[in-house]
Amino acid sequence: MRSKHLVTLFIITFLSFSTVKVWGKDVFAGFVTKKLKTLLDCNFALYYNFKGNGPDAGSFLDFVDEPEQFYWFVEHFLSVKFRVPKHLKDKNIHNFTPCLNRSWVSEFLKEYEEPFVNPVMKFLDKEQRLFFTYNFGDVEPQGKYTYFPVKEFHKYCILPPLIKTNIKDGESGEFLKYQLNKEEYKVFLSSVGSQMTAIKNLYSTVEDEQRKQLLKVIIENESTNDISVQCPTYNIKLHYTKECANSNNILKCIDEFLRKTCEKKTESKHPSADLCEHLQFLFESLKNPYLDNFKKFMTNSDFTLIKPQSVWNVPIFDIYKPKNYLDSVQNLDTECFKKLNSKNLIFLSFHDDIPNNPYYNVELQEIVKLSTYTYSIFDKLYNFFFVFKKSGAPISPVSVKELSHNITDFSFKEDNSEIQCQNVRKSLDLEVDVETMKGIAAEKLCKIIEKFILTKDDASKPEKSDIHRGFRILCILISTHVEAYNIVRQLLNMESMISLTRYTSLYIHKFFKSVTLLKGNFLYKNNKAIRYSRACSKASLHVPSVLYRRNIYIPETFLSLYLGLSNLVSSNPSSPFFEYAIIEFLVTYYNKGSEKFVLYFISIISVLYINEYYYEQLSCFYPKEFELIKSRMIHPNIVDRILKGIDNLMKSTRYDKMRTMYLDFESSDIFSREKVFTALYNFDSFIKTNEQLKKKNLEEISEIPVQLETSNDGIGYRKQDVLYETDKPQTMDEASYEETVDEDAHHVNEKQHSAHFLDAIAEKDILEEKTKDQDLEIELYKYMGPLKEQSKSTSAASTSDELSGSEGPSTESTSTGNQGEDKTTDNTYKEMEELEEAEGTSNLKKGLEFYKSSLKLDQLDKEKPKKKKSKRKKKRDSSSDRILLEESKTFTSENEL
């Protein structure tokens, strides 16, 4: 017995010692050294030798001061399965055999649940520096740079220009070109007149006979050939995060960098320090007022030099992938990490201030979890479900004894009292067709994503998710709202039967699922926005699961706003067991450790709120319609009792773990009636605003760079330059900016390039809709269950003349079954033209405002309606009436369940 105790004591001591060893100052050293050091060295060797010309010292990545470079290395090397590129297989660089088909991040996360990223950064930085020292000796490592290309000070070249021609050299066959040196450029600048006059003046001063002969050939062929003077590009190189962390504006950051660099008397080692010499030379050649302005710039931080030459677009920067460095056409410097987008031009000027635009604000890499970069679906699921598995033992099914003990009132819920309409705000507009509502719902969600991704406050982000609390609630709530709107219009005979096969939630799912659908607006290639859009895509799928009994083509579920929920949990809202039925349904998903638990819970609560919302709106403001479908909705007082019962159950000891798990991922706003209804009212206001905006064209900022209007052609100093520097009221960039801020500004006649969320589908796509619908049904099988043949054939027959929403952010046109094909086509294109005139593109796309994230449902800004939408009512066709009547006879009504 003593020996067993001694063995136990020895094991505990050994384990404690091992833990101290691993979790010391270098928290990952113990584990990584033993198991992953080899794989890490393989990745470093592959990265530094990627070009195949031996290790490159310019490839060093600063993991600590430039977190974006750390995540880049994780994304492109550590998180993918290790493979040797073809161009390196025959080179004896490193022994890669032990590392093949292994992912460093995947293996690392299997040992560490979800470590803090900062210690990982520091550890990998230390390992990289050891690798760098081993290969390059005493060379000082420098992290990669962010490039800011600049060519001109107004229209003066910063560097000596290049004279390009289309005159062919008789010997080489290449076009003649002439690169000016500094002395020649000084003569060029002193010339007065046209560019050819300056070239002729230069010819008279050149002493080198060979260069002089080249200029002579150019001058002699000026009348028959194309001759131009082009400015070379100078790349301002910055360690972006490190040098811009204290500045809230990209352009001001570059200004501050130039001040610090140029005011140093000794020669700076920074690669962009020579820009000061180029500017000093240029300003001395041009003389006043430029030289005086440069001195003011050096001493006064309010004096700015770097200005935008074009209205900036997203993405702000082009970040390169490893394969881009192998492209001989791009010819990238190894030390270049990212470069200012080619559409986002900058130039130098002492005139005016930097325009007020959020795109000029500094973008810094946020700290994200390593699990974001896991390679395979298996890795992602492993890390996600691991969180759920730690929640404890599963909840056992409720017993009859417990039910009889906890339920004191076994009577059925009944309430026929009238609604107090003085406390109800009118919000619902029944005249908007469902097809329009679908597109507007997607657009509203895009605007919500804008607000969330632009927030700088991470306080509302749950610890175990990258999505802000409340976002999934808004996504599901809006989907449920418009889904129920479809049912209400069906019951009131205001909508075409064909809309039953085009559910809003599925439209939203398809809209946000594919990132390629979002090209042309702010969401495309925005990592944060992509995460939110995919989360909304997944969440919206659970709405039809609750509203339509998980099988989306069962006609009986369209007969009320709660029948699908009743069938889902096998109980009726009036039953005293209804709350327990909902909780027990959710317990099954909680015990599985499934994300579906959270999404089903939000969807079920949303459906209950939606019943209350439509009951109040129809009862108070649409009394005739209300009498027709009164029995198809749950009375608000009953809804309140159900919601209160669910909330109390979730707070009980038995189900408290479920509530805790939910709050780890989502907001408690779902339990607040006031906040939920505020979100619904805000969406209704947005619908009215959007309908009004659809009637006019909104001017869109062109992506074409703005050309500066100045009489200065880059030749010499003249009086007009002084006027340009001192008297010009505003730059073209500011003029464009102010014009876009004024929403009532006059419209321009040129073709606009607005990126609409409601784009019409091309005619060629119409023929493919049937196939796409079938593909979608197969894809959604695991969520919705099998399809009924009768309803499937009905929906297939009724969709032959309809525009589908299966691809892209489009709205669908509906046409009655008794219209001819020509008339249907005319109506289709008429609606397409109306949609093309719609406004409502993202304000972030225009770069006019800086949105703060709305972290709670009641904090979302309300959209102000501007005009009333013209009333239009669609009648259901007679054939659809017969179909619905026949199908309704084959199913029991909701009152019999």
UniProtKB/Swiss-Prot annotation:
Its main location: host cell. Residues 792-801 have a biased composition (Polar residues). The keyword Phosphoprotein applies. The chain crosses the membrane at residues 597-615. Residues 1-24 form the signal peptide. It is a single-pass membrane protein; Peripheral membrane protein. Residues 788-845, 859-897 are annotated as: Disordered. Disulfide bonds join 157-231, 244-253, 262-276, 421-620, 475-536. Residues 820-832, 877-889 have a biased composition (Basic and acidic residues). Residues 865-876 have a biased composition (Basic residues). Keywords: Cytoplasmic vesicle, Disulfide bond, Host cell membrane, Host membrane, Membrane, Phosphoprotein, Signal, Transmembrane, Transmembrane helix, Transport. Residues 802-817 have a biased composition (Low complexity). The keyword Cell cycle does not apply. Proteolytically cleaved near C-terminus. The modification Phosphoserine is found at residue 804. One of its GO terms (cellular component) is symbiont-containing vacuole membrane. Disruption phenotype: Knockouts are not viable, suggesting an essential role in asexual blood stages. Conditional knockdown results in co-depletion of CLAG3.2 in schizonts. Mislocalization of RhopH2 in schizonts. Decreased number of ring-infected cells due to the defects in merozoite invasion capacity. No significant effects on merozoite numbers, maturation and egress. Co-depletion of CLAG3.2 and RhopH2 in trophozoites. Resistance of infected erythrocytes to sorbitol lysis, indicating defects in the formation of new permeability pathways. No significant effects on the activities of parasitophorous vacuole. Component of the RhopH complex, composed of CLAG3.1/CLAG3.2, RhopH2 and RhopH3 with a 1:1:1 subunit stoichiometry. Interacts with CLAG3.1/CLAG3.2. Interacts with CDPK1; the interaction promotes RhopH3 phosphorylation in merozoites. Participates in the formation of new permeability pathways in Plasmodium-infected erythrocytes enabling the uptake of nutrients from the blood plasma. Required for maintaining invasion capacity of merozoites. Required for the trophozoite to schizont developmental transition of the intracellular parasite. This is High molecular weight rhoptry protein 3. The gene is RhopH3.
